[in-house]
């Protein structure tokens, strides 16, 4: 059985008519930028436990459960738009890392959200890692 090396803490942030669950690892402050981990579709923040345990540097790490996943409440809708995830991420960062340029990792759908967020809020993202996110279709400026 796997033995957790770096236990997480949980918090809940009420925002946008939801109760957002956020998992935290490491100290509340660190000289390194906050590392934000975004899970993919049908996944949860706890899936990053193995990754966090493998990191050598001690730093502040946060990972939300997206709306409708894990311990975050679900909106009364049968679908979500990327704009919902982008707005949620922006508010989460304003709360947990105000004004800070973060290191952002996203897997699958989380990778897509991370790429879009870095595109619309480049001042908030210091480094970006996209794990298995798919690219968006090419467009022409006229579109």
Predicted segments, located by residue:
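Conserved HGGG/HGGXW glycine-rich cap/lid loop of the alpha/beta-hydrolase fold
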Residues: 21-74
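A conserved amphipathic alpha-helix that caps or lines the catalytic cleft of carbohydrate-
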Residues: 52, 93, 117-118
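A structural preference for long, well-packed, hydrophobic secondary-structure segments
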Residues: 9, 19-24, 37, 107-120
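Active-site loop/oxyanion-hole signature of alpha/beta-hydrolase fold enzymes
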Residues: 16-18, 23, 56, 63-105
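Short, conserved structural micro-motifs that define repeat-unit consensus positions
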Residues: 39-46, 66-71, 79-80, 104-116
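N-terminal cap/lid segment of alpha/beta-hydrolase-fold proteins
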Residues: 2-19
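Short aromatic-enriched loop/helix-cap "lid" or pocket-rim segments at secondary-structure transitions
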Residues: 73-76, 139-143
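Conserved hydrolase catalytic core segment
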Residues: 99-141
